Design a protein with these regions (language model features):
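Structured adenosyl-cofactor binding patch, chiefly the S-adenosyl-L-methionine
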Residues: 122-164
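N-terminal charged segments
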Residues: 228-315, 361-366, 370, 374-375
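Conserved acetyl-CoA-binding loop-helix of GNAT-fold acetyltransferases
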Residues: 285-294, 414-427, 448-449, 453
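A conserved beta-strand-loop-helix scaffold within acyl/acetyltransferase catalytic domains
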Residues: 371-410
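Conserved active-site alpha-helix within GNAT-family acetyltransferase domains
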Residues: 310-322, 442-460
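Conserved catalytic-core motifs of GNAT/GCN5-like acyltransferases
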Residues: 321-334, 455-474
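S-adenosyl-L-methionine/SAH cofactor-binding core of RNA-modifying enzymes
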Residues: 63-114
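Short amphipathic alpha-helix that is part of the acyltransferase structural core
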Residues: 229-246, 328, 335-370, 482-483
Length: 483
């Protein structure tokens, strides 16, 4: 990921972001930091970039010309399609979800104001996002830019090294982080809680959750209220049909899903990153009312829907133009114990990088979206099985969290490589505290057989993966009645 910072004080940015974890990430090529001095683009021979504001007032204002020319220089490096973030107290409050959204961009341009601000005309011309880090005034935008870059960069694959840690920290899933302790076991009469010394990971997990809940209830009741609503929805779906609703349960548990609707009649969850809506109507009579809660699809864009009941389809078709509908079953690994590992010592499973894009696209035909597959590779979510150093197959994790993309090359089949790949992904998700699940296209007996072998349970009910766009298909009239 590439960060471009337009500033009058480049040394402040460079010094602040070249140490510790971010400094290492820059050196290892996980992120790049391009700091551009606005003063270098002024047409004033004295390098002046500010002037008095029209209408009077205290202080000086940064002029439009040097900012615009500086922006154009940065935009040329990005292809001119990057989001431009202006740091201002007037902007939207920065939060973790916003950091996650920005982390999916390839390039970000930060514009740092100073003095009394920047000429409004250039802001209207180039800025896409106005962001604030709090209701207070600073001397410039450099510190807010560094705060945002730190929060965003740590979500980029490879930056933290331990990828799991980004998922289990303060603000994850509407909970504050649990208390943590290090050596010695006793300090100034204060002892480490006994449960943390027990080695019982189940007890430790339960204790940490209880501590997170207690802290959130005490310090952030606003967050805890949202957490309780999510937990109520999760418990409702568990009781009704755990296998059928595991994708929705996990979306909420992992902090991905946003509740659009939650009632006794049904639930809608939106995964903004995946541009996906998961829908469950507990009674057929609620399908129309539930579908009406869906927001409109923007023109020329596509949205995906997972329908957990077939009777939702007719109401979805009344609102949107259905492009495709695929029936499938959900396979869920309900155990907490790891699956046995590789069948052969000469088999190595590791993440694939972008260099394997063409090969993956050539062998995997279910998804032919090159941009999607590139994003999955860049984020480290496709794993390859190498037999004696040669790629023999691969599997991956889809954006919304399901396991899939399993493909073993024909010459390597019937050697247990597919099972080894799936076992590796299952164990990875178990280590994150997730419940592994995947989607099996209806009547795919070969895949169903593998899931049974791996110990996964299949939902009896059929789900439907639907692609849709704005508008509805025009009604095709039947034959004219005979006269």
């Amino acid at each position: 990921m590439n960060f471009h910072v337009l500033t009058l004080f480049p040394e402040m940015i460079a010094q602040g972001l070249q140490t510790s974890i971010l400094g290492r990430a820059v050196r290892e090529g996980c992120i790049t930091l391009d700091v551009v001095n606005i003063r270098d683009y002024t047409e004033n021979k004295h390098k002046k970039v500010d002037d008095y504001p029209y209408g009077g007032g205290a202080g000086m204002l940064i002029q439009a010309q040097p900012v615009y020319d500086c922006y154009r220089a940065a935009a040329e490096k990005t292809g001119g399609r990057s989001r431009v973030i202006y740091l201002t107290p007037q902007g939207k409050p920065f939060h973790q979800k916003m950091a996650e959204e920005f982390s999916r961009e390839k390039d970000l341009i930060f514009l740092c104001g100073h003095y009394e601000g920047i000429d409004e005309r250039v802001l209207e011309e180039i800025v896409t996002d106005y962001v604030s880090i709090g209701d207070y005034v600073l001397t410039g935008g450099e510190l807010p830019a560094m705060v945002m870059i730190d929060a965003i960069a740590r979500l980029v694959p490879g930056v933290l090294h331990n990828e799991i840690s980004a998922d289990f920290e303060t603000f994850h899933n509407d909970l504050l982080e649990y208390p943590q302790y290090s050596r010695p076991e006793e300090w100034r009469g204060r002892k480490v809680p006994e449960v943390l010394l027990s080695g019982d990971h189940a007890r430790i997990g339960t204790w940490r959750l209880e501590q997170s809940e207690a802290r959130t209830r005490k310090y952030r009741p606003d967050m805890f209220e949202k957490y309780e609503i999510r937990q109520t929805c999760i418990e409702t779906m568990r009781k009704k049909n755990k296998l059928l609703y595991m994708d929705m349960i996990e979306s909420l548990r992992r902090g991905r899903g946003k509740l659009i609707c939650c009632s006794e009649k049904g639930i809608i969850i939106e995964d903004e990153e995946a541009k996906l809506y998961m829908m469950a109507a507990f009674e057929a009579s609620a399908a129309e009312e539930l579908t009406a809660c869906l927001p409109a699809i923007p023109e020329n864009e596509t949205r995906e829907f997972v329908l957990h009941q077939e009777y939702l389809a007719e109401h979805l078709e009344k609102r949107f133009c259905i492009l495709e509908s695929t029936p499938f079953h959900q396979a869920v690994y309900t155990q907490r114990t790891a699956v046995p590992g590789h069948p052969a010592a000469n088999l190595v499973i590791r993440p694939l990088d972008i260099g394997y894009k063409e090969e993956v696209m050539r062998h995997y035909h279910t998804v032919q979206d090159a941009d999607y597959m590139e994003e999955r590779l860049r984020s480290g979510n496709i794993y390859g099985a190498f037999l004696d150093g040669r790629l023999a197959g691969f599997a991956g994790v889809h954006r919304e969290g399901s396991l899939g993309m399993l493909e073993v090359y024909e010459e390597y089949r019937r050697q247990g490589i597919g099972a080894a790949l799936e076992a590796s992904l299952i164990n990875l998700h178990l280590s994150c505290g997730y419940t592994p699940y995947g989607d099996i296209i209806a009547d795919n007996e070969k895949s169903e057989k593998l899931q049974n072998k791996m110990g996964l349970c299949l939902s009896r009910d059929t789900l439907y993966w639907v692609s849709a766009q704005a508008g509805t298909k025009p009604h095709t009239p039947g034959p004219a009645p005979e006269e």
